[in-house]
């Protein structure tokens, strides 16, 4: 699995480097097309599911008619399960959750792992002993992130790949260009069920 992803990232970087040598492409030039190609390559790895750890999740807001969306890779979230938790239920849209997360853009030559644009902890790496998981409502995130959360269980640790359409789309922020695919490392620490769990304090 790691070998496949390494080859995928290497191919992306080689393409970028070749273009830059010709003076044609900056880090964010042709960004939309490159992000679409990146998600397509991730989708192919997920579809092969060589290590049986991939999940392909249809966006939660598209209803149950999966056949209508078959073949459109921009309507799915691609999740690779890094660690299975011990929880038995997944959060619903109106539930609240505590999560550790780190978000980054697709890999580029300048940022081979992808430029980090946000994370829930202050240090370079997560310290589960001291870092308090971020609290928010399940449905308060972008569609792709919420979709993944609604399939996770407490303790799960996933890497999720979100097409731009299920992220910020044509909207840009100070650290996220428009039409950016998003990559998140997410650990679901706790679920608070709406109308039942009123104490959302940590520990």
Locate the predicted segments by residue.
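Cross-family detector of peptidyl-prolyl cis-trans isomerase
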Residues: 19-203
